[in-house]
Amino acid sequence: RRHILCYDDSPAVLDFVGSERAREVAMVGSACPDHLVHTKHWPLFVDWDGVDVEGLKARLAQEIARYREAYLRYVETHRSPQDPIMDPSPRIVLIPGLGMIATGRDAFMAGVARDLYHRAIAVMHGATALDRFVSLTPAEAYAVEYWPLELYKLTLRPPERELAGRVAVITGGASGIGRATAYRLAQEGAHLVILDINREGAEAVAADLVARYGEGRSLAVPCDVTDEAQVAEAFRQAVLAYGGVDIVINNAGIAHSAPITETHLEDWDRVYNVLVRGYFLVAREAFRIWKAQGIGGSMVIVASKNALAAGKNVAAYSSAKAAEVHLARCLAEEGGEIGVRVNVVCPDAVLRGSSIWDTRWREERARTYGIAPEQLEEFYRQRTTLKVNVFPEDVAEAILFFASDRSAKTTGGILTVDGGVPTAYVR
């Protein structure tokens, strides 16, 4: 089961975990019976010298395994035959010099565990200042944690959604396909990190996702995908906010249309910087995280019909999109050994809500076809086999398929969402 993590290095936490008697006091037990449901009776306390990071990683894995075994022994000692067995993973992890990591089924519940343990720290400080800190016995703690009425409340929860506990990073998430994808993944329980060069747009999407789906459900990070440092910082913020990354939607967009003789070098470089360099930088950072996490991942590259079919007056854009498709194939080969899947969605003519189509791109494409800009939607509809227009929500459904376990055995694949364009049929 996947959890969302909440990291806390506040002064109160660092002072407590760094104190001489921190382990002794913390392992006495919970500070309040009401906390048990959210924090468990005991935290996981992991000693660390503050220097050996690789050693800490190895020790964390070992200590979590030991904690789970100890929790299962505690349950088996006190449970009745009809009692369920809760998730044995720790809810609170304390590490001297680093702070506290709280966990939960989503960001809100991880935040609840964090806040409750702050209160526990205050209680432990107060008790030890006056005398000593005492808690419930294991039997008493079990009776509270597995109280029948509390167990009944758990049965009233709605079933977990398909992407519950997963974190998705979306580039170009402030508008168009990226925005629609953020909402679709959120509907399935994902936490969203919205990356976009448009800070206000990204913040608006993230704020609306939080309003709709709950506290902590989304984070906005302004990011120029062509900037190596900004990409690395964006992923760092995602990991600090939620504990890791599971899904990456490589979607940042730009477009340019002109005959090759009128395509300036700066135009060519600008398109390739976003669509090739940017997609590479995002993919590289994602792979670094996935390799460290060791639990796989899923990347969806949003290419274009133009990656598969030659087009007039779009040499820079089309060739860059073709490069994205082959990048995805190469990444799929590298990702297989670490459980990472990489797939491609190729949409076409998604005009609604797109920041690209609100620029000169619309006029340039209309000029290429010899029609007025306002005629583009109907022109694109008529040229499709199905005689339909394609909307951002249509593409979001295809992205969800590749991002989720529905496509668990597919990598290196291409899914077109174009209404049927014969020249772009995948062969």
Regions found by a protein language model. Name each.
Residues 288, 333-334, 408:
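Alpha-helical segment proximal to the catalytic Tyr-Lys
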Residues 304:
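Residue(s) in the substrate-gating loop at a strand-loop-helix junction
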Residues 258-261, 309-315, 337, 387, ...:
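Active-site loop immediately N-terminal to the catalytic Tyr-X3-Lys motif
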Residues 259-260, 264-272, 362, 380:
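Substrate-binding pocket helix/loop in short-chain dehydrogenase/reductase
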Residues 399, 411-427:
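Short C-terminal tail/terminal secondary-structure segment
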Residues 249, 336-341, 410-412:
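Short, small/polar-rich loop/turn modules that mediate ligand/substrate recognition or access, typified
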Residues 283, 320, 328:
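Active-site helix of classical SDR
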